[in-house]
Regions:
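Short beta-strands and strand-loop turn motifs
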Residues: 37-41, 68-70, 146-147, 179-185
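Glycine/Thr-rich phosphate-binding loops of Rossmann-like dinucleotide-binding domains
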Residues: 23, 28, 111-114, 153, ...
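A short alpha-helix-loop-beta-strand transition element characteristic
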Residues: 66, 123-126, 173-183, 207-212
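Flexible, glycine-rich terminal cap/loop adjacent to redox cofactors
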Residues: 171, 187-198, 203-307
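A Rossmann-like FAD-binding core segment of flavoenzymes
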Residues: 31-134, 197, 204, 217
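FAD-site-proximal beta/loop scaffold in flavoenzymes
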Residues: 1-10, 97-170, 177
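Rossmann-like NAD(P)H-binding beta-loop-alpha module
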Residues: 6-48, 155
Length: 307
């Protein structure tokens, strides 16, 4: 695997600027490798709102030699002095670049067509996924499927929850996969985490929303930690004021997002969250303060006129 190498490459190319690619890039940069990243899309960390990703990008500007967006690798040739890679696109170098190691992190392809599921009568779609219902049951009533093979997002915590539902359903219980959100976390430095709907998804779906953003530059704990580059953002339905999404960028963002997940599942509104007493000084209280910002009652920031 990517972490079982016998030596640390001096110069490394990561193909793919998604979560896995950036996590591996962070690891090897920390170990001393000079890293280039190439990504076909116009931004890194697909799925996250740009404002979250931009904080990560600014903090890590010194880590990476070259980040090539709207660019792709077209050819790689192993020679005595390394791997010569040719690029094309908006940020493509004019000449081939030489690397000690190339890591391909462009996603995974489901293998439903390669496991002989058809011999059990289990349907597999054209992409290789196995379709299931809300109880994770396939078209064969006594066969269940969970995890990456049933579709996106390909995340371990989603698979575990699906496993619980499938086991309970198989035992005859009325258990269904009906979660309102599935959190995503990039274990980079800083971490980036989000749950529920993003701002981009709200805009695409025509959802009228409001948000509250609390900058960690105003967090006593973040300042004391020497890591105040992040922020906490909560997204609310503008009509009901119920939370529908949230994102956090900063140290331990993955640990903090759980409260946002629970708030979404419980249908909490901005008042529920802002009136929940959070311990001080902690990073977690930024969630309550973001709700205060959305409600127009935050006393830890200069007065803001509520829109």
């Amino acid at each position: 695997g990517a972490l079982l190498l016998k030596s640390i490459p001096k110069r490394m190319l990561v193909i793919g600027g998604g979560i896995i690619g950036l996590e591996m890039a962070t690891v090897y940069s920390t170990l001393g490798s000079r890293i280039d990243i190439v990504e076909m899309m116009d931004g890194l960390m697909a799925g996250a709102d740009r404002d979250l990703e931009k904080v990560w990008e600014k903090f890590n500007a010194h880590r990476f030699t070259n980040v090539m967006l709207k660019t792709r690798a077209t050819n790689a040739e192993a020679k005595k002095d390394g791997i010569h890679v040719t690029f094309e696109g908006e940020k493509a170098p004019s000449a081939p670049q030489v690397y000690d190691l190339v890591l391909v992190a462009v996603g995974r392809t489901p293998n439903g067509k390669k496991i002989n599921a058809d011999k059990a009568g289990v349907a597999v779609d054209e992409r290789g996924f196995i379709p299931v219902d809300s109880q994770l049951r396939t078209n064969v009533p006594h066969i269940f499927a969970i995890g990456d093979i049933v579709g996106q997002p390909m995340l371990a915590h989603k698979a575990v929850h699906e496993g619980h539902v499938a086991a309970e359903a198989a035992a005859g219980q009325k258990s269904y996969f009906d979660s309102k959100q599935i959190p995503s976390v990039a274990y980079t430095d800083p971490e980036v985490a989000w749950a529920g709907l993003t701002e981009e998804q709200c805009k695409t779906r025509g959802i009228d929303y409001e948000k509250g953003v609390f900058p960690w530059a105003a967090s006593g704990r973040a300042i004391a930690n020497g890591r105040d580059e992040g922020f906490t953002k909560l997204i609310f339905d503008k009509q009901t004021h119920r939370i529908i999404g949230g994102g956090i960028v900063g140290t331990h963002a993955g640990d903090l997002i759980g409260e946002v997940c629970l708030a979404i599942e419980m249908g909490a509104d901005s008042v529920d969250i802002r009136k929940t007493i959070h311990p001080h000084p902690t990073l977690g209280e930024s969630i309550g303060m973001a709700a205060e910002v959305a409600h127009g009652t935050c006393t830890d920031l200069p007065p803001m006129k509520k829109k």
